[in-house]
Amino acid sequence: MVMLDLLSNALIQIKNAEAMGKRQVAIWPVNKLIYYTLRVLQRHGYVGEVEYIDDGRGGKYVVQLLGKINDIGPIKPRYPVKYREIVQWEQKFLPARQIGILVISTNQGVMSHVEAKEKKIGGVLLAYVY
């Protein structure tokens, strides 16, 4: 089986585990983009500890779930967004103001839309969570 989008696969694994009421989920295969996205989710309190386990086959992340995710998913296609356009995308993907985050890949790293607005930079939309 060929996995074309590892980030999308990881987010769907988290969504399914949350729906089943699991306390943790193992995500594999992994890459740096998944790690940085998980760190953003961790900083905003959507997931707990993220642990990397090297199993000799590329490794995997074990993510502690806190039960705070109502919906999570990738944004496809990955739209480029300017600093001033972030509010429009917020309205499109998030249920209300101040609820949830958009994950954005910028030239200064992967961050939430809140951090991107504070730094006044744009990037590419990766995912949403609330």
From Swiss-Prot:
One of its GO terms (molecular function) is rRNA binding. GO terms for cellular component: ribonucleoprotein complex; ribosome. The keyword Ribosomal protein applies. Transmembrane segments: none annotated. GO terms for biological process: translation. Keywords: Ribonucleoprotein, Ribosomal protein, RNA-binding, rRNA-binding. The keyword Ligase does not apply. PROSITE patterns: RIBOSOMAL_S8. InterPro entries: Ribosomal_uS8 (IPR000630), Ribosomal_uS8_CS (IPR047863), Ribosomal_uS8_sf (IPR035987). Part of the 30S ribosomal subunit. Belongs to the universal ribosomal protein uS8 family. One of the primary rRNA binding proteins, it binds directly to 16S rRNA central domain where it helps coordinate assembly of the platform of the 30S subunit. This is Small ribosomal subunit protein uS8. It comes from Pyrobaculum neutrophilum (strain DSM 2338 / JCM 9278 / NBRC 100436 / V24Sta) (Thermoproteus neutrophilus).
